[in-house]
Amino acid sequence: MKVVALFLFGLALAAANPSWEEFKGKFGRKYVDLEEERYRLNVFLDNLQYIEEFNKKYERGEVTYNLAINQFSDMTNEKFNAVMKGYKKGPRPAAVFTSTDAAPESTEVDWRTKGAVTPVKDQGQCGSCWAFSTTGGIEGQHFLKTGRLVSLSEQQLVDCAGGSYYNQGCNGGWVERAIMYVRDNGGVDTESSYPYEARDNTCRFNSNTIGATCTGYVGIAQGSESALKTATRDIGPISVAIDASHRSFQSYYTGVYYEPSCSSSQLDHAVLAVGYGSEGGQDFWLVKNSWATSWGESGYIKMARNRNNNCGIATDACYPTV
């Protein structure tokens, strides 16, 4: 009788929630049993209601971005924050980029169009954002120096950049310390030779398959969006850290993201600033995330610029030297 009841419950789920069935199909969701599915459905419906109510504000012109169902829509915000972040604040560098010189003003910069940015990647349910931000910065600088865009191994950083560098694999890490590891190690392997696994594993670095090297890093003047803009324009893609803890970030879809309750000091996620511009009168930073192309604007987010360092985007920014 219990089996029949559960079967009927499953049929009822499918009939009553076509958006749920679409979500499961699109993202390949299979749950252990119907009890877990019922729980995930309730989470999904709660997120769906939040998204629909938020998007009404967007339609009324009260906010500058909208939300959508994505691969995180069956996660509570607490679960999302527990598994999808991983940034730890690193040491302040000896070298600091402070230039805000009067070079010809650029209203828009997009390093993707210049070939300095690899395709969007996916960290999975592993707190390795720090590794993706690190490789993104090195990939960009390596391209600008050599003319060759090489996708680099985040898995090597997850597996090998612990120990005296204090990174903790899928439990988080520091961009600056990861860069120091690459410098001291003599390089980082290519993605193709050391592919990503979204889990902690033993170190398998191979000096014969190094894709890029670096000599150190330079920090951006803390909290200065002006210095960050100049660095993004003149240097290339910049590793940045942000507060990505809010439900609005979890479900971001398109538009210029401004979150009034964002912190400029409590940062939990490392990403890559690859440009800047304006949209509908709103200045933004163009930011590459590591949550696959199904999140945001094909894996990117436009984050508010010149809004008092919203979400801390200029609080802890740096780039590698190569």
From Swiss-Prot:
- Keywords assigned by UniProt, alphabetized: Disulfide bond, Hydrolase, Protease, Signal, Thiol protease, Zymogen
Give the enzyme's EC designation: 3.4.22.-
Name residues in a coiled coil: none
CDD domains attached here? Answer: Peptidase_C1A
Give the disulfide map: 126-170, 160-203, 262-311
Renumbered to this chain, the signal peptide range is 1-16
Instruction: Write out the GO MF terms.
Output: cysteine-type peptidase activity
Residues making up the propeptide? 17-105
Q: Where is the active site?
A: 129, 269, 289
The answer to keyword Cell membrane applying to this record is no
What PROSITE patterns does the annotation carry?
Answer: THIOL_PROTEASE_ASN, THIOL_PROTEASE_CYS, THIOL_PROTEASE_HIS
InterPro entries named in the record: Papain-like_cys_pep_sf, Pept_asp_AS, Pept_cys_AS, Pept_his_AS, Peptidase_C1A, Peptidase_C1A_C, Peptidase_C1A_papain-like, Prot_inhib_I29
The source's superkingdom equals Eukaryota
One record GO biological process? proteolysis
Similarity comment: Belongs to the peptidase C1 family.
> Do you know which PANTHER family this protein is assigned to?
CYSTEINE PROTEASE FAMILY C1-RELATED (PTHR12411)
Protein name per its UniProtKB record = Digestive cysteine proteinase 1
Protein species of origin: Homarus americanus
Q: What gene is this protein translated from?
A: LCP1
